[in-house]
């Protein structure tokens, strides 16, 4: 085997043994020594905790107010029924939340096949038993909420946020969204030509049937690759803060003195002194304005009152006045 001593081996063989529709064994080799556990543990954790899926989150059963009760004519108690519903395997297309209904009467088992749903929902294991009716006159009706999520979310984590709005009789269920039911990996020895210190990673997994095992491995690897992508170039993934540029001058200073609606006499006196903008005016002092021909104390008082109503005054100092936009116009 030719190659640099610092060059890492890349897996060249990926073998997928489909034991059943829900059970598969994936073999990956060759791997550098130690990489079997590195990749195997990472993929195992992602498959168990980060895979998206659908799960039962709430149940309403007619005649049942709380989970610590029983229902006449039903063999199982309510806690056992909720536990059975927790194992319901559902595939939902195009929606994040659906409501399923179940109505059954007469002696016999109540299974997932008895659930009524629309075309966007598929019950993967219709033979899954929910409960048993033990009397000809017994019946059971329930509404089942199925939501899309990720990982495992216990009912206790949702109690505080939903307690105020949750009516009596609506029972919360621990939501196990992950479609992966069992995952285990093993690292075996591998050999390539003269090298005998290599790893072979064998991953064995079972799903609830809502996802193909091969697709589950592919999604987990994609999630891992996306999380590591930021480290490739060590780039900063944070969005840069956009700082708002504050204008150099208050917009009111850039408006013409005509906007002050002064008397004709006062306005004409200011224009005669080349005071065209409010910014020009506020930089003048009272003494300077009184030297303006035909502008007396009455006009000065008027100007001061108008400026004060806008939060301005005479004798202000403005750095870098006039701005380029005004200077160019002049």
From Swiss-Prot:
Pfam families: RNA_pol_A_bac (PF01000), RNA_pol_A_CTD (PF03118), RNA_pol_L (PF01193)
One of the GO BP terms on file: DNA-templated transcription
Function statement: DNA-dependent RNA polymerase catalyzes the transcription of DNA into RNA using the four ribonucleoside triphosphates as substrates.
SUPFAM superfamilies assigned: C-terminal domain of RNA polymerase alpha subunit, Insert subdomain of RNA polymerase alpha subunit, RBP11-like subunits of RNA polymerase
Domain notes: The N-terminal domain is essential for RNAP assembly and basal transcription, whereas the C-terminal domain is involved in interaction with transcriptional regulators and with upstream promoter elements.
Protein name: DNA-directed RNA polymerase subunit alpha
Gene that encodes it: rpoA
Chain positions covered by the region annotation Alpha C-terminal domain (alpha-CTD): 249-330
Subunit structure: Homodimer. The RNAP catalytic core consists of 2 alpha, 1 beta, 1 beta' and 1 omega subunit. When a sigma factor is associated with the core the holoenzyme is formed, which can initiate transcription.
Gene3D superfamilies in the cross-refs: 5' to 3' exonuclease, C-terminal subdomain (1.10.150.20), DNA-directed RNA polymerase, insert domain (2.170.120.12), RNA polymerase, RBP11-like subunit (3.30.1360.10)
């Amino acid at each position: 085997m030719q190659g640099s001593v610092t060059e890492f081996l890349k897996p060249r063989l990926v073998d997928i043994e489909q034991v059943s529709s829900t059970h598969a064994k994936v073999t990956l080799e060759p791997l550098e020594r130690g990489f079997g556990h590195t990749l195997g543990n990472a993929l195992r954790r992602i498959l168990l905790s980060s895979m998206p899926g659908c799960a039962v989150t709430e149940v309403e059963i007619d005649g049942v107010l709380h989970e610590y009760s029983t229902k006449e004519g039903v063999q199982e108690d309510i806690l056992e029924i909720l536990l059975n519903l927790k194992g319901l395997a559902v595939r939902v297309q195009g929606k994040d939340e659906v409501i399923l209904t179940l109505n059954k009467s007469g002696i016999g088992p109540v299974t997932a096949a008895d659930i009524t749903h629309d075309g966007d929902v598929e019950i993967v294991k219709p033979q899954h038993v929910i409960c048993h009716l033990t009397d000809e006159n017994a019946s059971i009706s329930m509404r089942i909420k199925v939501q899309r999520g990720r990982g495992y979310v216990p009912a206790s984590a949702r109690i505080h946020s939903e307690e105020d709005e949750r009516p009596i009789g609506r029972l919360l269920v621990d939501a196990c969204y992950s479609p992966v039911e069992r995952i285990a990996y093993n690292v075996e020895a591998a050999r390539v030509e003269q090298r005998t210190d290599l790893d072979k990673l064998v991953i064995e997994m079972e799903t609830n049937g809502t996802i193909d095992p091969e697709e589950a491995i592919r999604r987990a690897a994609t999630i891992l690759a996306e999380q590591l992508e930021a480290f490739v170039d060590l780039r900063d993934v944070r969005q840069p803060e956009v700082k708002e540029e504050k204008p150099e001058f208050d917009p009111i200073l850039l408006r013409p003195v005509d906007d002050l609606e002064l008397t004709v006499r006062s306005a004409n006196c200011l224009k005669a002194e080349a005071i065209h903008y409010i910014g020009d005016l506020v930089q003048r002092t009272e003494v300077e304005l009184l030297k303006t021909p035909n502008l007396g104390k009455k006009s000065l008082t008027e100007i001061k009152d108008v400026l004060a109503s806008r939060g301005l005054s005479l004798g202000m100092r403005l750095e870098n006045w006039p701005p380029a936009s005004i200077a160019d116009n002049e």
